[in-house]
Amino acid sequence: MIIPTADLFEALVGQDINVSIAGGTESWRVVSVKRREQHSLRTDQPFNVYLSAPASNDRRQGTRSSTLPNGESLEFFGVPVSATKDAISYELVFN
């Protein structure tokens, strides 16, 4: 499993990742990455990632398994933060 970094997600902006759901997978788009101020408790920089899921998404927060475009696996905890008629926006926080 790959270690999530801001650099990793910044390279994925505009690309889709496949996220496992009950009964299959969904394509979620990596929309943006926000680097936050580094603090003394970490050696790396905290960051947030914003993903766009299909409007038909289950809209639940929780741990998700995904596959990146390069085939690597990644687990993350996603929280839905907004919805439109076209998509559900999720936030991932890496403190």
Predicted regions mapped to residue ranges:
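Short, compact, well-ordered microdomains
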Residues: 61-95
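A structural detector for beta-sheet-dominated domains
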Residues: 20-22, 31, 52, 69, ...
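Short linear regulatory motifs enriched in tryptophan with gly/pro/ser
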Residues: 4-6, 23, 27-29, 48, ...
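Short, conserved beta-turn/loop elements at beta-strand boundaries and strand-helix junctions
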Residues: 34-39, 82-86
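N-terminal trafficking/processing presequences and adjacent post-cleavage segments
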Residues: 1-33
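Acidic, aromatic-enriched beta-alpha/helix-loop junctions
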Residues: 39-70
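Contiguous interface-forming segments/domains that mediate binding rather than catalysis
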Residues: 3-4, 12-15, 36-39, 55-60, ...
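Surface-exposed, interaction-prone regions used to assemble/regulate multi-protein complexes
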Residues: 28-31, 37-43
